[in-house]
């Protein structure tokens, strides 16, 4: 639903998550059924092109050249439209932590969570929805995919949590920059990703965010430490924070008891801090 108060007002606390989604998104008469397209028509000319850009990103085409190829538009024109969508707060530009804004690894994502949900689940299923197949859309398209969708949403919540803690000086470092990192690990020659990384110039904080139904295991911590070695040069101290929807295994809890460089944050802690 994003953070728009009017959208949040559509939520009925007496209904289940499934019931709320079906009522607010999956009927042709739903309040949010055409909201994304209506907003685009109000804000931009050629809403069809802008919509195609957002659809491409929602489908996994996140680099500028991928987007322009997908929608069949000139790359310069496409970048102009992407910039406008960024200015509107619908999209955002992202580069791997520590790299320049002009990096060739730059990608674009959907910032507005209502747009992100709409283009992932409503736009692509409009034909089904318009034939009254809302239950099928929920069971076959949304429910099996929702944990994957929530991954990036959870990362954003975790970053907001760290920013709040950092502002109050409640972390082991007082970082001046935070972000996400992806790229090639020179040691393994494989593609790696670190969900959250922050530093204050000499000390680093590395984070992993898991929106899963099972407890986070010790293997996740070991993998995070291995990936963090990419930043071993000029690094004085390292700290690790693990975020988990479903808590932690006993092995992780035992590790934390003997290592104060590891922080654990579960869903209850995140909810308390919101």
Regions inferred by a protein language model and the residue ranges of each:
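Amphipathic alpha-helical "lid/sensor" segments that cap RecA-like P-loop NTPase cores
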Residues: 1-39
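Short amphipathic alpha-helical boundary/capping segments
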Residues: 35-46, 66
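Hydrophobic residues on short alpha-helical segments
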Residues: 47-58, 159
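Short acidic, hydrophobic short linear motifs in intrinsically disordered regions
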Residues: 60-70
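Short amphipathic alpha-helical interaction segments
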Residues: 71-88
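A short, conserved structural fragment
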Residues: 86-98
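Short, Lys/Arg-rich nucleic-acid/phosphate-binding segment
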Residues: 95-107
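A cross-kingdom feature that marks ATP-driven nucleic-acid transaction machinery
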Residues: 106-274
């Amino acid at each position: 639903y994003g953070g728009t108060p009017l959208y949040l007002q559509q939520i009925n606390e007496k209904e289940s998550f499934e019931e709320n989604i079906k009522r607010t998104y999956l009927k042709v008469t739903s309040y949010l059924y055409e909201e994304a397209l209506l907003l685009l028509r109000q804000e931009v000319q050629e809403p069809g092109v802008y919509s195609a850009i957002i659809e491409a990103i929602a489908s996994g085409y996140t680099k500028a050249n991928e987007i322009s190829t997908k929608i069949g538009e000139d790359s310069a024109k496409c970048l102009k439209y992407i910039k406008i969508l960024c200015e509107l707060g619908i999209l955002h530009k992202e580069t791997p932590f520590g790299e320049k804004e002009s990096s060739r690894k730059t990608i674009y994502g959907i910032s507005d969570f209502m747009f992100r949900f709409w283009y992932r689940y409503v736009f692509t299923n409009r034909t089904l929805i318009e034939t009254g197949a809302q239950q099928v859309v929920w069971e076959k398209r949304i429910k099996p995919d929702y944990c994957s969708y929530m991954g990036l949403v959870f990362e954003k919540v975790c970053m907001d949590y760290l920013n709040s803690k950092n502002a109050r000086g409640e972390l082991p470092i007082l970082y001046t920059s935070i972000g996400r990192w992806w790229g090639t690990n020179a040691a393994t020659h494989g593609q790696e990703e670190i969900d959250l990384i922050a530093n204050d110039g000499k000390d680093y904080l590395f984070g992993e965010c898991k929106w899963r139904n099972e407890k986070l295991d010790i293997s996740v911590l070991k993998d995070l430490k291995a990936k963090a070695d990419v930043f071993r040069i000029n690094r004085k101290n390292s700290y690790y924070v693990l975020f988990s929807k479903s808590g932690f295994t006993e092995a992780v809890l035992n590790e934390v008891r003997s290592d104060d460089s590891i922080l654990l944050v579960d869903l209850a802690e995140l909810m308390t801090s919101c």
